[in-house]
C-alpha cells in the first residue's frame, strides 16, 4: 500500500437539526470543527414518511424552474 495518499481522519462534532450532538471521525474539515446539518435522518422525508418538500439551497431549484419551466409537457 502506498504511504501518505489517504486523507487524515480526525474527530469532528456533528450537530443534528434538533440540537443533539455526537462526535465522529471524518476527513471533513479540521480537528474539532463542528458540522451543522440542515437535514438529517430524523427529519428527512425519505426516512420519516413525511411530505416530500424541497429545500431550496441558494435558489438552485428556482433557477432551474426559471430556466426550464416553459418546457412543460
From Swiss-Prot:
Keyword set, alphabetical order: Ribonucleoprotein, Ribosomal protein, RNA-binding, rRNA-binding
GO molecular function: rRNA binding; structural constituent of ribosome
SUPFAM superfamilies: L28p-like (SSF143800)
Top-level lineage group: Bacteria
GO CC terms in record: ribonucleoprotein complex; ribosome
Function according to Swiss-Prot or TrEMBL: Binds the 23S rRNA.
Known partners and oligomeric status: Part of the 50S ribosomal subunit.
HAMAP family (alphabetical): Ribosomal_bL31_1
Protein family per UniProt: Belongs to the bacterial ribosomal protein bL31 family. Type A subfamily.
Name used for this protein in its record: Large ribosomal subunit protein bL31
The organism of origin for this protein: Bartonella henselae (strain ATCC 49882 / DSM 28221 / CCUG 30454 / Houston 1)
Gene from which the chain derives: rpmE
